[in-house]
């Protein structure tokens, strides 16, 4: 097993250890979060946890949770979320995030913002000085508005591109039935303002900027060939 995979597993274990019995847990999307879901399921099976309920942020998270026999519910049936565990594509020094590489950022933002504690799990390669430095900013758009929205996104200084499917002809379609526009910036100096400007465009459902939402960042690192987990509060 390669070092990066081991590192992601270690981060997943640390995140899963934060879950307590009798709690509602937001289950995020992505390769590192998948290990957290696995270890939550293993803690349940071993009797270390009991009476927890998961709120999945995507179809992928739902399938994984069912695989590991984590009981699931929906936001209609719960009045709070104790902790949410989710990944990120970029993290800046202020703990602001870009998410949405898996095209699930709208549902993720709803669940993560509702959580009393939002724990982000990443590898050290996701840490950046400025958001938008390496990763495109995803924007979920209703299909009929795609052309005017792309024009307005370009007017904000970004280079928009409709995300196309892999191993599928045509564009990526989100779990909500919408399209994703990936927006390239040279760097984002004011993520809070940009988040609001994009969301104010008619036809935009949500974008992948998560500003002031994360409580704890768990960073997986390889030091002297060994995986380590560092916590950023």
From Swiss-Prot:
InterPro entries: NagB/RpiA_transferase-like, Ribose5P_isomerase_typA_subgr, Ribose5P_isomerase_type_A. It comes from the Bacteria. GO terms for biological process: D-ribose metabolic process; pentose-phosphate shunt, non-oxidative branch. It catalyses: aldehydo-D-ribose 5-phosphate = D-ribulose 5-phosphate. One of its GO terms (molecular function) is ribose-5-phosphate isomerase activity. Coiled coil: none annotated. Transmembrane segments: none annotated. Its EC number is 5.3.1.6. Keywords: Isomerase. Pathway: Carbohydrate degradation; pentose phosphate pathway; D-ribose 5-phosphate from D-ribulose 5-phosphate (non-oxidative stage): step 1/1. Substrate binds at residues 29-32, 86-89, 99-102, 126. The active site is at 108 (proton acceptor). GO terms for cellular component: cytosol. Catalyzes the reversible conversion of ribose-5-phosphate to ribulose 5-phosphate. NCBIfam families: PRK00702.1 (NF001924), rpiA (TIGR00021). Homodimer. Belongs to the ribose 5-phosphate isomerase family. This is Ribose-5-phosphate isomerase A. The lineage of its organism: Bacteria, Bacillati, Cyanobacteriota, Cyanophyceae, Oscillatoriophycideae.
